A protein has these predicted regions:
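C-terminal, surface-exposed recognition/capping segments
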Residues: 1-57
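Ala/Thr-enriched low-complexity intrinsically disordered regions
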Residues: 13, 30, 59, 70-72, ...
Length: 452
């Protein structure tokens, strides 16, 4: 073994006397050039000096057991070893970890992370003009974004404001394509890993592995557990925050974020996004960051209900939440305390917030879920969802008849709703809606085929 070469690996010419072209190493580190079996044959490089594990911290011993690629790049007196896309600098003698890590802010403007963010931002939008324009000069655009973020010369473009009317009227503020890329990088690499650490399991919105169907399954599970313990005689408090996104106070939000994030550069970018709207209240519905900010804003309420009020069966999806309990009077007291909590953050409960018998069920995430006398949990698509889908199908069929969209677009929209409806007890509803869909689309498709 030559001086300056790490124990267990040799990176020069292979062993010519060995049929497998692998250089063997004796237990003392010297080369073994014979063809006999050697227990140290093909030893992978070690990152740590050869010493007993009892002398190492627990975390260090865990890293020692990692398998690293045998190929290392020799550079002067050091080797750089690839590990999950990052570089770890190791000294030749013993692979002592010296570490090369990016700060949270560097993760945001790192070129590879910006490229991944661009790929996420373009999903389902490549046909749009803004996405196509950004993609024409992709490398130049990403390099410019990286430079602007690094030097803090980055600014947000004006929002594109429009209204949507389903499921209810809302004002949406859509940001520019470059800002979408930045926010994807910010959320994926910094905000989501840090902010979601304190979230309870039953916070369902905008998180990997969760969502509407997960929330519905948890509600169903809670109802079954409650029935096994208390029977059908129970109550459910269904709550809703009035104009939630438009009522979030900037100063309170910034304080909550600073309790979890300390990097001043990240906080500069976060403040820039929060203050991008007029006034000191409200965050844009169209921003990706707004989803995480909204989840964080009521994270304290989740812990308050679970830990202070002692409610076992509780769940929240953004600004909609429910509490299940056997005592109606206690739920009334919970409502008062929840109202006081949200008012301290500049919010108010919707007038629809009320307490219902558990057997009457609750409207949550597009379904009406209720408990029967036998303990079965039934989940039905809400009437409003049915009517909205019929109106949407009629509108899409008219656009298809006018030649503005193709049949595949209509089918994809309908299949999306159909998949959602299948999560409930909706067999007969789906059959009726299938018939309605076929009556709108199939005759037109048959007529087009006859023309050709």
């Amino acid at each position: 073994m030559r001086e300056g070469e790490p124990f267990g690996v040799h990176l020069d010419t292979p062993n010519s006397s060995n049929a497998y072209n692998v250089r063997n190493v004796n237990s003392d580190g010297t080369l073994n050039n014979n063809n006999a079996y050697n227990g140290n044959r093909g030893v992978r490089p070690l990152r740590w000096k050869m010493r007993s594990s009892r002398h190492k911290p627990k975390a260090e011993y865990h890293h020692q057991r990692k398998v690293y690629p045998a190929a290392a790049i020799h550079s002067g007196g050091k080797y750089r070893i690839a590990d999950a896309g990052a570089f770890r600098v190791a000294e030749c003698k013993g692979y002592i970890q010296r570490g090369f890590f990016m700060t949270d802010y560097e993760k945001i403007y790192n070129f590879e992370n910006l490229y991944r963010a661009y790929r996420k931002a373009r999903q389902g939008k490549r046909w749009k003009g803004a996405a196509a324009k950004f993609e024409v000069n992709l490398l130049e655009a990403l390099n410019l974004l990286s430079y602007q973020l690094k030097t803090k010369k980055y600014t947000l473009s004006p929002y594109n404001t429009f209204e949507v009317f389903e499921p209810k009227r809302r004002v949406v503020m859509s940001n520019s394509y470059k800002d979408k890329v930045v926010q994807h990088s910010l959320c994926d690499n910094v905000l989501e890993p840090i902010l979601t650490r304190s979230f309870i399991r039953d916070n369902y919105a905008s998180q990997v592995g969760k969502g509407t169907h997960y929330g519905l399954d948890r509600l169903q599970e809670f109802m079954r557990r409650f029935y096994r313990k208390n029977g059908i005689d129970g109550w459910i408090l269904k709550g809703d925050i009035s104009k939630y996104f438009y009522s979030i106070r900037h100063d309170v939000l910034k304080t909550l974020i600073r309790e979890k994030i300390t990097d001043p550069d990240v906080l500069w970018l976060v403040d820039l996004i929060i203050d991008s709207t007029e006034g000191n209240v409200g965050i844009p519905i169209g921003n990706q960051t707004s989803q995480l900010f909204a989840l964080l804003y009521l994270d304290g309420l989740d812990h308050f209900v679970k830990e202070k009020l002692g409610i076992k069966y509780y769940g929240r999806y953004m600004d909609d939440f429910f509490l299940i309990h056997h005592d109606k009077a206690y739920l009334q007291e919970c409502r008062k305390q929840i109202e006081a909590f949200v008012q301290a953050r500049g919010l108010s409960l919707n007038a629809k917030t009320n307490i219902f018998p558990l057997k009457h069920g609750v409207d949550f995430l597009g379904f009406h879920t209720y408990l029967t006398e036998s303990g079965a949990v039934i989940r039905k698509v809400r009437r409003r969802s049915k009517n909205n889908m019929k109106r949407k199908l009629k509108k899409l069929a008219a656009l298809h008849a006018a030649g503005r969209i193709n049949a595949k677009t209509v089918e994809q929209s309908y299949q999306s709703w159909r998949g959602h409806a299948e999560k409930g007890n909706s067999y007969h509803l789906i059959r009726r809606t299938d018939h309605y869909y076929n009556s709108l689309m199939k005759p037109k498709e048959a007529a087009q085929c006859q023309k050709h």
